[in-house]
Regions:
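Basic, Gly/Ser/Thr-rich N-terminal segments that form RNA-phosphate-binding interfaces in CRISPR RAMP
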Residues: 1-246
């Protein structure tokens, strides 16, 4: 039986969570998304790869590089080898192929699930960065962490209620009219101040409680797409400024 644990990831720069090739190569699924909120997620394989790299690069004076690699494989599983290693020569026999592929991956001591959003930073021209979430994301955060717990008042020690948008009858629209909060596609209206949002800021993060916004579950995907940084990833030839594979 595994011992369950969770962690909070605070990204200090735009995070690439999609495929390395974009629409120019026919890839229409540019980002890994949660099926319920259509917001970006970090696959567990990416998190495991980061831990593997840190463990391999760590300085262990009492261990050789091979011993460090073996220890990494024990904790995070044997790394999958490239497919081109199969049958590199025409003389590869079936027995040799079996020997090279049977131990490609092994069970790890540590298993990672995907990382979901809690607060999403959205750029607002002329205003501070605002952090947006929805009740469904906060509910998932509460189920995983078992909190937050109210620290003051009559309800001290109780589980905090999941905050909801101020007006449940009217969804959030991005309108071309003047209102409280301006996004890059319009204005966000129907905003009310909620003091209880401070409980939903993970401890140790630098998110300002005054810059938090909770929207409807149906609207978080649109705002999420607005907040994405559009950037095409390309690889140039070494000797000429020309994109490879084109």
């Amino acid at each position: 039986m595994y011992h369950k644990a969770y962690g909070i990831i605070e990204t200090l720069a735009p995070l690439h969570v999609g495929a390395s090739a974009g629409e120019e190569t026919g890839n229409l699924n540019l980002i890994f998304r949660d099926q319920f909120t259509q917001t970006g997620i970090i696959p567990g394989s990416s998190i495991r790869g980061r831990f593997r790299a840190d463990m391999r690069q760590s300085d262990r004076p009492n261990m050789t590089s091979n011993q460090t690699k073996a220890l990494t494989n024990v904790w995070y599983g044997h790394d999958s080898e490239a497919d081109e290693t199969e049958g590199e020569s025409d003389g590869t026999t079936e027995a040799n192929t079996t020997d090279t592929t049977k131990d490609r991956t092994t069970e790890a001591l540590v298993k990672f699930e995907y990382a979901s959003l809690v607060w999403l930073p959205v750029f607002c021209p002329g205003q501070p960065i605002v952090w947006v979430t929805c009740p469904r994301l906060l509910k998932r955060y509460q189920q995983i962490t078992g909190g937050p717990i109210i620290q003051k008042g009559d309800k001290k020690g109780q589980l905090a209620n999941i905050p909801k948008p101020s007006d449940g009858k009217h969804p959030v629209y991005l309108r071309e009219e003047r209102d409280r909060l301006f996004f890059n596609l319009g204005f966000l209206d129907n905003l009310d101040k909620r003091p209880d949002l401070t409980y939903w800021v993970p401890t140790g993060t630098k998110v300002e409680p005054d810059n938090l916004v909770v929207v409807q579950d149906a609207d978080i995907s649109l705002i999420h797409d607005m907040a994405l940084y559009r950037q095409t990833r390309t690889q140039l030839h070494d000797d000429v400024k020309q994109i490879q594979n084109f």
